[in-house]
Each structure stands twice: as structure tokens, then as C-alpha cells.
Design a protein with these regions (language model features):
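N-terminal, Lys/Arg-enriched amphipathic/low-complexity engagement segments
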Residues: 120-168
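Short, structured beta-strand/loop micro-motifs enriched in basic residues and often containing a Trp
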Residues: 128-137, 169-176, 276-284
Length: 428
């Protein structure tokens, strides 16, 4: 009996000193005055030495049993992290020193290991919404958890909150379906939302008879003084045309071809940002009101919160360039989309891709600012993938708080040029 006892006495200290395996990808969350800052944490281990990245910053540190210590530095600040770690979680403190003022800020942090892709093929989800939201908020509880490669079929209410039966379910203002939580999506990733199908699910839509002030000079404003009334349209879903229910004599034979689109596709905004209303737009997407977001297109959005938190809504039976009368043909919609994820790819402004074009969406309080954002966004895209210069510009949005400009480039002009870098999508 003495030999087995001696054996255990020898190896027990070695087990107690074993290093925790921390290599891999983590989601780190720092509590900064009650505001959670979420970042991708990537760790590499060589003995007791750590290296890797936290967000965009390189890190160096050490691992001592269950103790972890690392430091990050950039041009503006340095941060020192100390904590304890298990195989799948971390807790600790962080001290940040401002590079200019030398002010010290104390905070706490936690981290959890990012799970692996689940086994099996992508899934299709049927989601029936019961609640709709009027902000692109990171604090709203996700309605459904999905994985890259999954497809979701759902419905949206119209801009006034009415569903396919005409029942008002929520206050107006572009109420959204969602948010959908995408597993393994981390800040710094790129979310690809493939619009598989957009189907009209009722036979009427609402619009207006006026023109938005941004597009009106003083002479036209006088002529429009008696406008501002709602106009109802009949949607012929067989012939895919629309007619006014009560047209004037001049418009009695007027028809509009239908091209269903989504006015809103957005994700939750980033750290310390107030949740924007669903009438707003920005780098997170949102109420872009771009008539190129149709069946067969793909919307690319920067992930800024864990899980991305995707919202969709504001279906239009058809919309012209600019939504000049404040509303398109507003209606409810059946929506089907598939999610992909491109890890660690940064874009400054939303992108839309069709079978024939790549399009950078610029959004700003002025048309000039939106034009600059679209040009910069396209230049970034072409620099990343093609190293070419932009060509065509289309104004997509003037009705809301932010104007929008879409810079569009035909794909056939890019065919002779090889991609500078191949985008890697997360395995499905």
C-alpha cells in the first residue's frame, strides 16, 4: 500500500500547478461606469507567456496557474489586466492610464470562451413575432438565437404598426421584428444578411400626397400647402401592380409596378451609444430606405455587440429613389433571410450587394456628408478587395433625419480584376 500512496503524494503538487488552457477566442466585457464594453479577446500561449489581441490592440502577458496578467497599449492609452481564469471564464480588474492626462481609471472585467460552431447542417427557423420594437437597442432581449448559415422566415408590420390583417399591433414609427442573436458574432465581425425572399402578405398599402421639406423650394411649398393627406393603394399581388383606391380623374388609369423592399435592416449600435429610434439610420444600418434592399440582395453590417442583434422591418411594396413624399407604399411583409458571418472584417458604412452591383451606403445629416460617406465607403471596399475607383452615384434617402447616398459600381466592370483578398466566411 505504501507505493501507491507515495505515487499520489508526488504528482498531486504537479496537478495543482498545471496551467489553465486559455488559448483561443474569448468575449471580454469591461464594465466602464456601468457601460459594458464588449471586445474580442484572442490569446496565444507559449509556456507561461501570453500574446494576442484585445479588440484592435495587441497584448502581452503571463499566465501563472489560475492567475492571468496582460497589458494592452495604443497611441491613446495603456491598460493592465489582472484576474483569475478557468477553462471557460475569467474575472478580474483593469487599470487604464490615459496617455495624455495620465489619469487612472479602475474597472472590472469578465470574459467567456466563445463556443464552437454547433454540429449538423444549417437550420431553417419559422418565427412568429408577438412584440415589435421601436429602437435598435442592445438591451432588448433577443427573440431568437440563430447560427451563421441559418435561415429565418418571419413577418413584419408596416410603418404604422399594422400587420397583414390590418390589426394595429404597436405604435407607428417603423416598428421592427427582432432582435435576432447570431451565435459566435463578435464586435469587429461583419454580418451578411442575404435577403432570400420578400413577399407581400396583404392587398393594400398606405402613402402620402406631399413632398418632404428637404426637397421643396418656396414656390413648390406654396403649391403643396393643402397636401399632407394619406393615400391608400390597392396591391394586385398577381400582376404585381398598384392603383390608388380613390384616384383623382388624372390618376384613374395610373398604375405603379411593385418591387418589394425592406426599409430597415439594422444591428444594435456600439459601446456607450444611445439606442437610436427606428426612424434613424447610421453605420449600424437601420432605416436606410434604400430601394436596392430587395429579394436577392445582401446587406453587410458591422457587428458592434455580441450576437449582432439584427432587426428587420419597414416593408415597402415599392419605393422610388429618395422616398420624396415621406413614405413609400408602406405595407406588412413576409420576410426570409439567411445569415453569414465574416470574422474580423471592418467596414465604416453599410454595404449592399446585388447580383449585378456592389453598393456603399452613405448616411449623414446632409446630402454632402452622405455623399462623402458613400464615396469613402466604396473606396474602402475597392481598396480592400479590388483597388479600383468608384463610378456611379444614386441618392437613396432624403425623407428622414439622415440623408442617404448610395455609390453603385457594376460588377461586370470588376470581372477582369482578381480579388485582392478573399473574404473568409465562417464555416456553416
Amino acid at each position: 500500500m505504501l507505493k501507491p500512496l507515495c505515487f499520489f503524494l508526488v504528482v498531486a503538487p504537479a496537478l495543482m500547478m498545471a496551467q489553465t488552457n486559455v488559448a483561443g477566442t474569448w468575449l471580454a466585457t469591461t464594465d466602464i461606469f456601468g457601460n459594458p464594453l464588449h471586445q474580442r479577446l484572442t490569446l496565444e500561449v507559449n509556456g507561461s507567456t501570453l500574446s494576442g489581441k484585445l479588440g484592435n490592440d495587441k497584448l502581452e502577458g503571463t499566465l501563472n496557474g489560475a492567475g492571468i496578467h496582460f497589458v494592452t497599449k495604443n497611441d491613446r492609452r495603456s491598460s493592465e489586466y489582472n484576474g483569475t481564469v478557468t477553462s471557460d471564464s475569467m474575472t478580474g480588474t483593469v487599470v487604464t492610464i490615459d496617455g495624455d492626462t495620465k489619469e487612472h481609471t479602475n474597472a472590472t472585467f469578465t470574459a467567456k470562451r466563445v463556443g464552437e460552431r454547433r454540429p449538423g447542417p444549417p437550420q431553417r427557423h419559422e418565427f412568429v413575432p408577438t412584440t415589435f420594437y421601436r429602437r435598435f437597442s442592445p438591451d432588448t432581449k433577443p427573440v431568437l438565437t440563430i447560427w451563421p448559415g441559418d435561415t429565418v422566415h418571419t413577418t413584419t408590420v408596416d410603418a404604422d404598426g399594422a400587420d397583414e390583417k390590418g390589426v394595429t399591433r404597436v405604435l407607428g414609427g417603423n416598428p421592427e421584428t427582432g432582435p435576432f442573436y447570431v451565435e459566435t458574432a463578435l464586435p469587429g465581425d461583419l454580418l451578411a444578411v442575404h435577403i432570400v425572399r420578400l413577399k407581400l402578405n396583404r392587398d393594400w398599402a398606405m402613402s402620402d400626397d406631399f413632398v418632404v421639406p428637404r426637397a421643396v423650394d418656396s414656390d413648390l411649398a406654396v403649391k403643396l400647402k393643402d397636401t399632407g393627406k394619406s393615400v391608400q393603394w390597392h396591391l394586385d399581388r398577381t400582376q404585381m401592380i398598384a392603383r390608388q383606391d380613390k384616384p383623382t380623374e388624372h390618376l384613374k388609369d395610373y398604375i405603379v409596378p411593385l418591387h418589394p423592399m425592406l426599409g430597415c435592416v439594422g444591428v444594435a449600435p456600439g459601446f456607450a451609444s444611445a439606442a437610436p429610434g427606428t426612424g434613424d439610420s447610421g453605420s449600424y444600418g437601420g432605416n436606410m430606405d434604400f430601394n436596392g434592399i430587395v429579394e436577392g440582395s445582401t446587406v453587410y453590417l458591422q457587428v458592434r455587440q455580441p450576437g449582432a442583434l439584427l432587426y428587420v422591418g419597414d416593408g415597402h411594396a415599392v419605393q422610388g429613389d429618395g422616398e420624396l413624399n415621406g413614405n413609400a407604399l408602406e405595407t406588412s411583409m413576409d420576410v426570409e433571410f439567411t445569415i453569414d458571418l465574416i470574422p474580423q472584417k471592418h467596414i465604416d458604412t453599410p454595404r449592399v450587394e446585388s447580383p449585378t452591383h456592389i453598393m456603399a451606403v452613405g448616411l449623414d445629416g446632409s446630402l454632402e456628408g452622405a455623399l462623402k460617406a458613400a464615396t469613402s465607403g466604396m473606396a474602402q471596399w475597392l481598396e480592400q478587395d479590388y483597388k479600383l475607383t468608384p463610378s456611379e452615384i444614386v441618392i437613396n434617402e432624403v425623407a428622414d433625419r439622415n440623408a442617404g447616398v448610395v455609390l453603385r459600381l457594376p460588377k461586370d466592370r470588376l470581372q477582369p480584376i482578381p480579388l485582392a483578398t478573399a473574404e473568409k466566411k465562417q464555416p456553416m
